[in-house]
From Swiss-Prot:
Homodimer. GO terms for cellular component: chloroplast. Transmembrane segments: none annotated. This is Betaine aldehyde dehydrogenase, chloroplastic. InterPro entries: Ald_DH/histidinol_DH (IPR016161), Ald_DH_C (IPR016163), Ald_DH_CS_CYS (IPR016160), Ald_DH_CS_GLU (IPR029510), Ald_DH_N (IPR016162), Aldehyde_DH_dom (IPR015590). Its EC number is 1.2.1.8. PANTHER family: BETAINE ALDEHYDE DEHYDROGENASE (PTHR43860), BETAINE ALDEHYDE DEHYDROGENASE-RELATED (PTHR43860:SF2). Belongs to the aldehyde dehydrogenase family. It is found in: Plastid, Chloroplast. It comes from Beta vulgaris (Sugar beet). One of its GO terms (biological process) is cellular detoxification of aldehyde. It comes from the Eukaryota.
Length: 500
């Protein structure tokens, strides 16, 4: 499908501004490798201007235009944004599909979730009003204390390319609900919908500078944003390597960060399951979003007593996946995001083969697709736990398989990773599922499913998958400072020192 790609500038202080260095970055359609447009290439100079705009918006009129307003006031803007995104849903869905390569049906769900997220955090903003001046019980009657929840300030939001607008929304919505102002730096590999979102902000009358959007390369725009002394907090989603750099930059200024990083999530399948039902969930857990999910359950652990039958059914189901242009009806696997990502995934597969692993299906480009960054969904067996393919995040449609003989062995294999974002367990024995859930070392556990994610529930990892929680009531807390206010309500002197 061909469609015109809007040509935008940087969105700063409520205006469209050309990058100071006037550079642009080409947009490549991952489905056919053609250049379909370009985005502005922001630099540290543009970040400087954007952060200054966010700081002015935070402080303007002593915060009475945004930061110090009621949550209910800010909620009206968030609901207006949700309505506008829904109104322009078809436009956003098409742009997300062509830019990221994800199947059209998935992009529809993503944009629905964007609107849902703004609606949800509008409710959280309103609920925050009732929590203001929450009393604190003290042991001395002479004193009275309460708590204020106040925006943390100017926040830098650095977001990935696998869910371009949705992952940005996970950060924008709670930050704005809390009363923060923000500078968003989306991934240069998929920025179109984030730039278009700037137009939505103008259409709903969001005060200038409350949200600023600077596209560009990570070293040129993302790194200066993370290190900027006038940014009060950084929230980052991306690779563990880049997350470490963000954390190091923030550490120089003792600046709080929230990091949602990589994963190598396990999926444990016990012997008492409905095989076809769990096969489908296994595929969904690894091949959804073309395999490019930080929480992908890409390490399959299946009980040895059903392994042969399960893997046979899994391979047959996987070979039946429709791989095509993401706009084609029924597409269930599109291209990966870029040539660099394509080459990286293929190198993982070739290394696995050289280390002695067996490719049960996939592992190459689909024969019917000569252009585009398409990779067949790949299942790999005969794996040792020391192999690269088992230990490192691939971020593509690649599933590794091992067997286990006992619950203890399954848990040992599942937890033997430096990551801890998510896990899944399948069994008809719900007591076993509950027991295993408590012992899995991850920020999220799915029981008899994989990948469902709701704005109402907390999201985040442990270990090298990061820290902090997004979404739910925990999401807005990320962007708040808690201040205690304690008053002496007695008319009596304190009496600690003798009067002269």
């Amino acid at each position: 499908m061909s469609m015109p790609i809007p040509s935008r500038q940087l969105f700063i202080d409520g205006e469209w501004r050309e990058p100071i260095k006037k550079n642009r970055i080409p947009i490549i359609n991952p489905s056919n490798e053609e250049i379909i447009g370009d985005i502005p290439a922001g630099s540290s100079e543009d970040i400087e201007v954007a952060v200054a705009a966010a700081r002015r918006a935070l402080k303007r009129n002593k915060g009475r235009e945004w930061a110090a307003t009621s949550g209910a006031h800010r909620a009206r803007y968030l609901r207006a944004i949700a309505a506008k995104v829904t109104e322009r849903k078809d436009h956003f869905v098409k742009l997300e599909t062509i830019d990221s390569g994800k199947p059209f049906d998935e992009a529809v769900l993503d944009i629905d979730d964007v609107a849902t997220c703004f609606e949800y955090f509008a409710g959280q903003a309103e609920a925050m009003d009732a929590k203001q001046k929450a009393p604190v019980t003290l042991p001395m009657e002479r004193f009275k204390s309460h708590v204020l929840r106040q925006p943390i300030g100017v926040v830098g939001l650095i977001t990935p390319w696998n869910y371009p607008l949705l992952m940005a929304t996970w950060k924008i919505a709670p930050a704005l609900a809390a009363g923060c102002t923000a500078v968003l730096k989306p991934s240069e590999l998929a920025s179109i919908t984030c730039l278009e979102f700037g137009e939505v902000c103008n259409e709903v009358g969001l005060p200038p500078g409350v949200l600023n959007i600077v596209t560009g390369l990570g070293p040129d725009a993302g790194a200066p944003l993370a290190a900027h002394p006038d940014v009060d907090k950084v929230a980052f989603t991306g690779s563990s390597a880049t997350g470490s750099k963000v954390m190091a930059s923030a550490a120089q200024l003792v600046k709080p960060v929230t990091l949602e990083l990589g994963g190598k999530s396990p999926i444990i399948v016990f012997e008492d399951v409905d095989i076809d039902q769990v096969v489908e969930w296994t595929m969904f857990g690894c091949f959804w979003t073309n395999g490019q999910i930080c929480s992908a359950t890409s390490r399959l652990l299946v009980h040895e007593s059903i392994a042969a039958e399960f893997i046979d059914r899994l391979v047959k189901w996987t070979k039946n996946i429709k791989i095509s242009d993401p706009f084609e009806e029924g597409c269930r696997l599109g291209p990966v995001i870029s040539k660099g990502q394509y080459d990286k995934i293929m190198k993982f597969i070739s290394t696995a083969k050289s280390e002695g692993a067996t490719i049960l299906c996939g592992g190459s480009r689909p024969e019917h697709l000569k252009k585009g960054y398409f990779i067949e969904p790949t299942i790999i067996s005969d794996i040792s736990t020391s192999m690269q393919i088992w230990r490192e995040e691939v971020f593509g449609p690649v599933l590794c398989v091992k067997t286990f003989s006992s619950e203890d062995e399954a848990l040992e294999l599942a937890n033997d990773t430096e990551y801890g974002l998510a896990s899944a367990v399948f069994s008809k024995d719900l007591e076993r599922c509950e027991r295993v859930s408590k012992l899995l070392e991850s920020g999220a556990v799915w029981v008899n499913c994989s990948q469902p994610c709701f704005v109402h529930a907390p999201w985040g990892g442990i270990k090298r998958s990061g820290f902090g929680r997004e979404l739910g009531e925990w999401g807005i807390e990320n962007y708040l400072n808690i201040k205690q206010v304690t008053s002496d309500i007695s008319n009596e002197p304190w009496g600690w020192y003798k009067s002269p």
